Amino acid sequence: MIIVTGGAGFIGSHIVEYLVQRGDDVTVLDNLNTGKMQNLSKVSNNVNFINGNISEYKLLEGLVSDSDGVFHEAALVSVPQSFEMQDEYFDVNVNGTENILKLAKEYGFKVVCASSSSVYGNPKQIPIKESDNRNPINPYAQTKLKAELLAEKYSQNDVHVIGLRYFNVFGRRQSKEYAGVIKLFLERIQQNKAPKINGDGLQTRDFVYVEDVVKANILAMDSNVKHQFFNVG
């Protein structure tokens, strides 16, 4: 059985669809804070859905004790909101991740953990390499770095964990909220309006298609690689 935390979210739901199409037995854990059941409409009859939070240790333990692997996508992800809800972001993104790592140590399953390019902060050089310094500049990014440090700590105790640092992911079912710039651009173009660009237009961002993010997750889970972080962009 494969567990996908945050499996009703943008990226998680695409991972779930791939796993179901491959024939895997899939359980989704999502509290539907930002995830939506409609994201799972194509596969809802083929997954076991649990409405819950990764901060609920006993609930997690009951799910993962017989698991072959966990795709850990659940997180609070809004940078602006993270300034206002720092305790909540720490509880979910850090404590919730540690719950999964503790259980991975006890039960021996593999974890593919979603991280973020935001851990690098404002990079001094492009392209960014995995070995570059991590210098997060907002509370959200700080929680992702703390989660990475926990993963590194647990990997020293033979927990099989791979971290994927997503850059700006776009694709079907993407929210129009913060950072969904491609979706916003396309909507304005469809309305015969010019894309709205903030600032001087010289800023750059690295984008990655959601299906490519799915491929990265599957390769990470199926590989024999252990205890590494990879950029996905």
Which ranges hold each PLM region?
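Secondary-structure boundary/capping motif
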Residues: 59, 81, 173-177, 205
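Conserved catalytic core of two-component sensor histidine kinases, primarily the HATPase_c ATP-binding
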Residues: 57, 79, 194, 203-204
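Short donor-sugar binding/catalytic loops of nucleotide-sugar-dependent glycosyltransferases
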Residues: 32, 201-204
